[in-house]
Each structure stands twice: as structure tokens, then as C-alpha cells.
Amino acid sequence: MQGVVIKKLEKHKDERGWLAEIYRSDEFDFKPTMSYVSSTKNGVVRGPHEHKFQSDCFVFVGPGNFELHLWDNRENGETKGEYLKIEVGENNPTMVIVPPGVVHGYKCVSEADACCINLPDKLYKGEGKKEEADEIRWEKDSNSPFKIV
């Protein structure tokens, strides 16, 4: 899908546990401005939604696993209408950069709660949280063509 970056993350393991690089400024032309982490319970869906201006940099390393769903909803994109579903998380550590106009959402598919880290390139609600959120919340539209079941 045009503009979507999917990078398999390598867990370097030893007797102490593991370490994985999740973002390097010398690998991608992407500059995070904030970060957050979320935990999602088994069977719970987050999204789908999209952004007009913001790109997300999702990091799925566990615990837990997700089905990540992506739909290209960009009017003039060369991959408009394309759909992609991948399993990410503890079993498939992955970093995914999602550009504006790509509808995205994920569902926890593990028994245990699953964690996701996001490093978006725009501040949520802008400087000092004084702006409208850059979100088209497809999950609130019962007629949405974008469904995660």
C-alpha cells in the first residue's frame, strides 16, 4: 500500500530478556512529535479511523497480539481501495507507519491484553490541546464501509 511502511522488528534476546529498536531517524523520513501507549483487552476493537494530516507510527512488540486492518481511502492514491490485514504484536513484532488518508484500526486477538505504542508526527489536538482532533471516526458511522469484526 503506497506510503505505508511495515518493518519487522528484531528482538535481541539474552538472559536478561530482550531489546528491540523501534524507531531510527536515519531509516525513515518521519519525525514523531509525541508518543503514547495503550492496552487493549481480548476481542476489543480500536478504530477504524483516519487522519487528514497526521501520520501514525505504531509499534507492536507485545505483550499480546493484534489484527491490524488498513484501507487506502486516499482520493488520488495509486493504491486507492486496497485493503491489508496483518497480525502484529508479540508473535510478529512490527513497526507500521500509516500516512494520512489510510483508514486503520486493530483488534486484540490474544487471550492476554495487548499493548500498542504510537509515535505520531502531529500533537493530539495541537499545541496545548487547543485544536480539534484530526480524526475521522469511521467506527461511529453505522454505514461505514470500514469494518473490523
Residue ranges and their predicted role:
Residues 90-98:
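Short, exposed beta-strand "edge-strand" segments with a Pro/Gly-rich flavor and a Y/T-containing core
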Residues 1-91, 109-149:
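Non-catalytic, conserved peripheral segments adjacent to functional cores
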Residues 96, 104-109:
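Short beta-strand His + acidic residue motifs that chelate non-heme Fe in jelly-roll/DSBH
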